[in-house]
Amino acid sequence: MVCLGNICRSPLAQGILESKSSKLIVESAGTAKFHVGKSPDLRSINIAKKHNIDISKQRARQFSNLDFQKFDKIYAMDNDNYSKIISLAKDQDEIDKVELILNEEYPRTYKSVPDPYFGQKDGFQYIYDLLNSVCNKIIEKYEVR
């Protein structure tokens, strides 16, 4: 799960997916290093907590080339981060691991999960709802619980 700073969308996506399956290894990262080592945004922590998910112990980290070897699938939250991840890929196999997360629910639409960072508190509920729905699709696709 990859967004820009790894404090809003991707930690929330990680927490949601982890809450739905203990069989998946899920991590999150940011393409930028603004917040490396910091906790998720308090608004993400609070919206997750509202849904009985604890993401407070997560710490932001920057996406690296090693993630291509470590993970079978890499989900980008938006087109900009997708492009940044792809630019780090060394071959087609690595490129093929990267997908816009909302394409799992809305195939080939290339929709982005909006960044709620500069928005209002209710934007985080909207992001939670989007990510919760797409995480259900991911669980169905890979048939893991």
Predicted regions located by residue number:
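Phosphate-binding/catalytic loops
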Residues: 73, 83-145
